[in-house]
Amino acid sequence: INEINEVYIGHEDVQTAKMVAGEVSYKAQSVNLPSGPVLLQNAEKGNYSVKLRPTIGMSVFSLNLTTQDEAKRAVFNDLNFRKAMSHAINRDQINEIAYFGLGTPLQYTAFDADTAAFVTSDQRNANIKFDQDGAKKLLDAANVKDQDGDGDRDLPNGQEFRLNIQFATQGVAAQVVEIIAQNWSDIGITTSIKEVTSDEYRASQSANELDVHVWNKGEPLAVFLGDTAELVPPFASYFGLRNGMLWEQYI
């Protein structure tokens, strides 16, 4: 191979359309399951083949516990807030829309729970029940309330509370991000989304510029234990989901 020409396409639907039209020689990263039916239906016409490979990875969302915004940082480190944001997510809807009902909603356990006998059912299912009323009560307990009557919740200091999720489709399907952003907005945490390149996402994450971290994670316990980057802040290499960038500076 003398030359590889790679073009970034900023919208997943446009990327899929180009693959259907046979304009792509090879594509692996950033091709997510929701595109599967369209790609399979048009494989003969587009003169390409589709290989669906199994994976142990799962879409992981985390709040930046060392975000530069100190008011948000205090909220993100409140366990009531984090539980609320988890209970607000409609995982069954995500499973049906993004995974065609083939997935199993689970809590993230840092490694593939099926490779570790000590991971309990309670840990696998911690805070994953879709309960927006319960989520609102937890937000109240975290003092994240609507203080000005506009219908949106504010930070405890009275400042406007807005979240922006920057994501790359290499790490998560756009449909998953869209559903979660709407779920969070429904409980009063107005959330917007922006698709960026993988390089842009990684640079912003490592510069501690993101409120929410989003990536695909999953590896066997043996691999996890052999990778020291997973055990100390920021808990991943540059190419993974990182959290606690300021903790890394402290250490």
Language-model regions, residue ranges each:
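Extracytoplasmic/periplasmic ligand-capture domains
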Residues: 1-100, 104-105, 114-151, 155-251
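Outer-membrane beta-barrel and related beta-rich outer-membrane complex signature
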Residues: 109-110
